[in-house]
């Protein structure tokens, strides 16, 4: 596995990218993480068969270390169209007119679906893992979204909450476990420890102020009216007991998107990578293989 660290520019933002296995001659897979997760999250959460044998990129959410934001970056800058243009631009700068597969987790899943709404001609397929069409969240991350949604006066409290959690490793691990439903399996998974180690440097270096605009706007996201515009193959993956994105959102997505395939991880939450590792790896690889095979049809 060969990896390069890149930064791609978009409207004053420097969007961090990992570019892997550029020598492999096949369509690239683009991975977009969820909020609070730097791009190296994927190094711990993907199967070796993908990490080593596929050509892939991991593209950051805006404002997430090591990405950089411009002076004057504000919540009012962000909506569904802006996110679409951001990822459309970054992918185009990386891949030109070549079609790609996009895989996203949580807000990354939303971003992948949002790309599919607007850019069918540039995509081979989309996989949404615990993604959503509407920014109606529960759990610990839902509380952060609600807090940020109160406006500028809540920003110091938002930042303080994140600062406290990242300073205390035991607290950070506990809070991450609240994303899972099967916490016993999540906590026992070696992948969990690896993930927390992989993201640690970026988490500690994170400019917490840069996270606020996206969190402030998430509750306003809603692409449901546009889902019928999706014309590419889509796989929806969801935990049956996701505490952040209610599983009903995934059922609605699967019903609203033509020919969408639905994969449900029974008795799992927001982190199927750890909660249902073997099933997740099998389903992810199968979906990617299916999209790759469509090139020759």
What are these regions (language model features)?
Residues 98-141:
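Conserved hydrolase catalytic core segment
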Residues 126-165:
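Flexible "cap/lid" loop of the alpha/beta hydrolase fold
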Residues 13-69:
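Conserved HGGG/HGGXW glycine-rich cap/lid loop of the alpha/beta-hydrolase fold
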Residues 260-297:
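Catalytic active-site module of serine/aspartate enzymes centered on a nucleophile-bearing elbow/loop
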Residues 57-103, 282:
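Active-site loop/oxyanion-hole signature of alpha/beta-hydrolase fold enzymes
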Residues 241-245:
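Acidic catalytic loop of the alpha/beta-hydrolase fold
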Residues 230, 236-238:
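Short beta-strand/loop motif that positions the catalytic acidic residue
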Residues 137-139, 162-228:
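Conserved alpha/beta-hydrolase catalytic His-Asp/Glu region
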């Amino acid at each position: 596995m060969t990896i390069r660290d890149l930064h791609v520019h978009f409207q004053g933002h420097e969007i961090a990218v990992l570019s892997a296995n550029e020598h492999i001659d096949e369509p690239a897979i683009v991975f977009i993480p969820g909020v609070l997760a730097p791009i190296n999250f994927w190094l711990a959460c993907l199967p070796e068969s993908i990490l080593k044998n596929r050509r892939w990129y991991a593209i950051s959410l805006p404002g997430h270390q090591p990405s950089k934001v411009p002076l004057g970056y504000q919540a009012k800058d962000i909506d569904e169209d802006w996110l679409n243009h951001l990822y459309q631009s970054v992918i185009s700068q990386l891949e030109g007119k070549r079609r790609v597969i996009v895989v996203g987790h949580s807000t990354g899943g939303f971003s992948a679906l949002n790309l599919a709404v607007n850019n069918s001609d540039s995509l081979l397929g989309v996989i949404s893992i615990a993604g959503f069409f509407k920014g109606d969240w529960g759990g610990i991350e839902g509380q952060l979204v609600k807090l940020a949604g109160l406006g500028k006066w809540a920003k110091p409290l938002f930042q303080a909450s994140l600062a406290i959690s990242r300073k205390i490793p035991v607290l950070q691990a506990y809070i991450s476990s609240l994303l899972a439903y099967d916490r016993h399996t999540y906590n026992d998974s070696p992948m969990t420890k690896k993930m927390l180690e992989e993201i640690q440097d970026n988490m500690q270096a994170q400019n917490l102020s840069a996270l606020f605009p996206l969190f402030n706007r998430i509750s306003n996201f809603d692409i449901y009216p546009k889902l019928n515009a999706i014309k590419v193959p889509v796989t929806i993956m969801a935990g049956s007991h996701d505490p952040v994105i209610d599983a009903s959102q995934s059922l609605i997505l699967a019903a609203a998107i033509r020919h969408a395939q639905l994969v449900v991880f029974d008795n799992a939450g927001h982190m199927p990578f750890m909660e249902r590792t073997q099933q997740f790896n099998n389903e992810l690889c199968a979906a990617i293989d299916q999209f790759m095979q469509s090139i020759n049809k």
